[in-house]
C-alpha cells in the first residue's frame, strides 16, 4: 500500500547567518519531528541541529536574482527581487516534489504529517493566498 503521509519540509536561505527568529523556527520544526531540508547558496555557520543542507542551485540558479527587477516602480527596493526569486524557487521546488514548503520563520507548535494527495496553502487576508506554507 502506498504511503500517503509525509513529514518532509523544504525551505530556503539565500546567504549570511540565520537570524535568531529563523533559527528558533527551524529548531521548532525539527523538535516536532519534521524532516527539514534547508536549501542554500552559501555556507551557513549557525544551522540548528537536525536540519539537513542541500544545494539550492540544483533547484534554481541564483543568477536569476539579477534579472528580477521591479518594472512599475521607479524606486529600487532590494527586497522585491529577493521575494520574487523566493516565489520562483518554492514553485520549482514543488514541481520537483521536494516536500511541503515552509518559510524559515514559520514556528511549529506540534508534530504533524501531511497528506501527499492534498493541496496546502496559507490564507493571508481577504481573498489572498500567501506563500509561507505551500504544497
Enumerate the language-model features and the residues they cover.
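N-proximal low-complexity "stem/linker" segments adjacent to membrane-targeting elements
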Residues: 1-20
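Residues that flank catalytic or metal-binding motifs in active/ligand-binding sites
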Residues: 5, 32, 49, 129-130
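Hydrophobic targeting segments
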Residues: 5-11, 29, 36-38
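Short, well-formed alpha-helical segments that are part of the catalytic scaffolds
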Residues: 17-31
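Active-site-adjacent helix/loop patches that line small-molecule binding or acyl-intermediate pockets
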Residues: 34-42, 131-134
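Short, polar loop motifs at secondary-structure junctions
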Residues: 39-45, 107-111
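Active-site-proximal specificity loops/subdomain of glycosyltransferases
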Residues: 44-88
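GT-A fold catalytic core of metal-dependent nucleotide-sugar glycosyltransferases
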Residues: 81-129, 134-135
Amino acid at each position: 500500500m502506498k504511503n500517503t503521509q509525509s513529514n518532509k519540509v523544504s525551505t530556503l536561505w539565500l546567504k549570511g547567518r540565520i537570524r535568531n527568529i529563523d533559527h528558533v523556527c527551524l529548531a521548532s520544526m525539527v523538535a516536532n519531528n519534521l524532516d527539514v531540508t534547508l536549501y542554500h547558496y552559501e555556507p551557513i555557520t549557525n544551522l540548528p541541529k537536525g536540519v539537513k543542507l542541500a544545494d539550492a542551485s540544483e533547484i534554481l540558479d541564483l543568477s536569476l536574482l539579477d534579472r528580477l527587477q521591479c518594472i512599475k516602480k521607479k524606486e529600487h527596493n532590494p527586497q522585491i527581487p529577493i521575494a520574487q526569486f523566493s516565489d520562483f524557487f518554492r514553485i520549482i521546488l514543488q514541481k520537483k516534489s521536494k516536500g511541503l514548503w515552509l518559510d524559515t520563520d514559520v514556528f511549529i507548535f506540534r508534530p504533524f504529517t501531511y497528506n501527499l494527495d492534498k493541496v496546502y496553502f496559507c490564507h493571508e487576508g481577504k481573498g489572498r493566498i500567501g506563500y509561507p506554507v505551500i504544497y
